[in-house]
Amino acid sequence: LIVVGTDDGLVRISRDNGRSWDKHENFPGVPQKAYVTDVITSKHDLNTIYVSFNYHKYGDFKPYLVVTKDGGKSWKSISSNIAENDFVWTIVEDHINPNVLFVGTEFGMYFSMDTGSSWRKFKKVPTIPIRDLEIHEEEDDLVAASFGRGFYIVDDYSPLREYSKPIESKVAHLFSVKSTYQYIVAAPEKTATGHNFFSSPNPPYGVKLSYYLGNNVQSKFEERQRVESNKFKRGEIIDYPTAEKLEAEAKEKTPKIYLTITDSEGDVVRRISSSKNKGYHENYWDLRTFSQRNVSEENNYSGPLVPPGKYSVH
């Protein structure tokens, strides 16, 4: 199967190594002669093809993104909730989960977990054109090439494959953890290249731990502040807390979130303090056990490396 797109809005498909071609020129909602910016075939289904279009040279900055699941017999728009003025440059499909898609647009990047029915924008990507996307399949990294701002890498996006609407309704969810290698981190000196020396930070050493919290983990005092703030915004009367409530707030310990690492025997080898805010979070375990220093909440130092083996996180 060979699929090509042209600069005048055509998509041509060949099933005989280029000896003959089917022409496709009508796509739902896409203007005639729109520039085809990208064409990809699915890694999971021979009849599934994704095409993105660009019509900004005619003053139309809308995103145009379509898919066929029957080899081109019918096409469906999957632009859905991509911003109206954020036209699409490129699209890639996850190599393991066909529901996961990524697009690069004029103002950033989006991802979908439902084959384009809905999209979410990456929040920490600069507002710049993302002209090309590539997936490093061995590491599950997403590499983005921007126009004028270099390359950006999303390290190990594999939790997105597991992410779903039911997870958002849970109190908490811990995503699957990948195996990793243990090694001694080197600290080489810079070479004599002066101002030409450039390096980009690697992911932290160790195992990435990803989790989702359905709500902020709050103390009684923080919860009362939230309720009172909402009442103030609505113009409602705010009752002064009773002495019993104030005493309970004062005695309560500040709630914390810890990721607990255990070995194959169930013994705890490390606890890692993590964010207690609502949403998706990442943390790293550096493959070391507890510090040998005096125990305290402020002591976040690590101890010696743990022996290779099977470990769990809770």
Q: For the regions a protein language model found, what residue spans apply to each?
A:
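Conserved aromatic beta-strand anchor motif in extracellular beta-sandwich/beta-rich domains
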Residues: 259-263
